[in-house]
Regions:
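A short beta-strand segment in extracellular, disulfide-stabilized domains
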Residues: 13-24, 103-115, 200-209
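Solvent-exposed loop segments of extracellular immunoglobulin-like
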Residues: 24-32, 116-129, 209-216
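Surface-exposed, flexible coil segments in extracellular/virion-facing regions
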Residues: 31-55, 126-151, 215-240
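Hydrophobic/tyrosine-rich beta-strand signature of extracellular beta-sandwich/beta-rich modules
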Residues: 67, 162-164, 251-253
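Interdomain boundary/hinge segments at the C-termini of tandem beta-sandwich modules
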Residues: 83-87, 180-184, 268-272
């Protein structure tokens, strides 16, 4: 007899050691122990020919143990029994940065879990706001929560440290610690349409919040670089077109805050000059 099937964690504080319980009876017995696979297991006490050696398991896996017994006249193979070794799960989740609110965290797309030869029995996520940033919260969506294997989370602007813990039968859970940094979306105050006369002086363009930049809605209009230009930190619009033709020119104001870009569009109507014959 060689005992029964056993399980254990290779990463627990106490090493996973199995004593092979040999109850064979007879005179002048010789023993040969065989373990398959051989990688990840070693003899803690004794060797392959010891009566009741001890095995130390250092890697997760399913190991088959067999005992061959002989006394010179007879050879017998006892039935194989299995030892299941597992380890602390490995969890991989990359840091999240350069995102604009709301940021949709889809767990199945971002979480990698190596169960290390044992089923995950418990999951727990912890989300903690980092100091120095006014994090505005998050919402669990799609029926998930902080105990879901793959939680789905909508983050508002934030700076969080997230700990994702996945536990099997090992005493210590596997963890991934990662950062979530989501920038705040700051909208552009709606731009009113405006008018200007053909060939008038260039007009300074203004918008709120300040610090953004202007572009033409249609960058292919003739002489675009002269119509919209920047000088001394200000953007100017110059209506230098056919003096006798009415035009509508679309202008777009962009404002960036980190990864967030807000935009608004206005129409500049250009009135033609009077035509005198």
């Amino acid at each position: 007899s060689v005992g029964k099937d056993s399980v254990g964690c290779t990463d627990d504080p106490d090493p996973f050691v199995i004593t092979l319980n040999n109850l064979s009876e007879g005179d002048s017995l010789a023993y040969t122990w065989t373990v398959t696979p051989q990688q990840g297991v070693s003899f803690a006490e004794g060797d392959t020919n010891s009566e009741s050696p001890k095995l130390l398991f250092s890697e997760p896996g399913d190991y088959d143990v067999r005992l061959a017994v002989s006394n010179g006249c007879h050879h017998d193979d006892d039935s194989v029994f299995r030892i299941k070794a597992f380890a602390i799960p490995r969890v991989r989740i990359g840091d999240i940065a350069d995102q604009c609110e709301p940021f949709h965290f889809i767990g199945r797309e971002r979480v990698e879990v190596d169960q290390r030869n044992d089923k995950i029995q418990q999951v727990h996520w912890t989300i903690t706001a980092n100091q120095g940033y006014a994090s505005e919260g998050y919402t669990l969506v799609n029926g998930t929560d902080l105990k879901s294997y793959y939680p789905d989370i909508d983050f508002k602007t934030c700076d969080y440290t997230v700990v994702a813990a996945y536990k099997n039968r090992c005493k210590t859970p596997g963890q991934a610690v990662f950062q979530v940094k989501v920038d705040k979306f700051i909208p552009v105050i709606p731009l009113p349409d405006d008018t200007i006369c053909e060939l008038a002086e260039a007009r300074i363009l203004r918008a709120q919040p300040e610090g953004g930049w202007w572009t033409l809605k249609d960058p292919a209009i003739p002489e675009a670089a002269e119509v919209l230009y920047t000088e001394w930190g200000n953007s100017y619009f110059y209506p230098g077109f056919d003096p006798y033709a009415q035009k509508d020119i679309g202008l777009v104001y962009h404002y960036r805050n980190g990864a967030c870009i807000a935009r608004d569009t206005m129409n500049m109507r250009i009135w033609p000059l009077p035509y005198v014959e």
